Amino acid sequence: MTPREWAWEFLRRNPAFQRDVTAASRPIAGLTNPCLTWSRRPATCHAGVFCFAESYGRNSIVFWSPLWCVHVLPVIAEHLPASSETTPYQLLALPCRATVLLAPDKGQHVLLRNAEHTLQLAVSGADILHPVCLRTEAIWPAKLLRHRLRALECLNALSVGQRLPARLFPREKRGPRLNFVLRALDGSLAGASHRELAEALIGQRRVDADWRDPRDHLRDRIRRAVSRGRALMNGGYRDLLT
């Protein structure tokens, strides 16, 4: 999974976030497929990022805050004069699903997605539901450069009828470790003891042999995994967005 996908896996397990998502208003207006428009309040949690989410399910539509997530591409939408020779940008012409979120501050957030990947735009200016010209800054801080260039390449690919390139969505290198931590968190949230977690994650034979070792290596490993999982669930996932 990508870093954003791992961030979502931890955030969506946060009980406060789940309550906020459940309490948030539902979509109130829809357009014809493949474009859907929402107008709703944000779902947040006490230790979390400003985030809009359809639900807290694994495959939910999720909008991350541009203030936190480096993968969101900010663009300016401008009306095209009738005499313009510029090819207009039209959501309904793209070879992907498009969801537009209308935020309370009048901001427009666009999520472009195919079966595997997503691209999020933070749009200011003209109404993105009409044919427009999109502009963005050409110079970015060094820490944003790689992410912005990837997002631009994704946007260009969609604009010429291609899919979102898989090579622009690298997997998180810490995936195996995060998977271990996530499974430990799930077990802990379900009420499992540390020994039960160890048996599920490492195997009963190893646990029977090493659980009472005075050096506590196995116990410490489980304790660290649970602690790390809860930290990621309660706000630490933000590090995966930057």
Q: How should each PLM-predicted stretch be described?
A:
Residues 3-11, 167-174, 183-187, 212-219:
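Short, charged/polar micro-motifs that form catalytic or ligand-binding hotspots
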Residues 10, 141-148, 215, 222:
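Intrinsic-disorder-associated interaction segments
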Residues 1-133:
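DNA-contacting interfaces and partner/effector-binding or oligomerization modules
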Residues 27, 158-161, 232:
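Surface-exposed polar/charged interaction patches
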Residues 134-208:
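Mixed-charge (acidic/basic) macromolecular-recognition segments
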Residues 174, 178, 202-242:
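Accessory, usually C-terminal, subdomains that scaffold auxiliary metal cofactors
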Residues 11, 21, 185-188, 201, ...:
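Amphipathic alpha-helical interface segments used for dimerization/assembly
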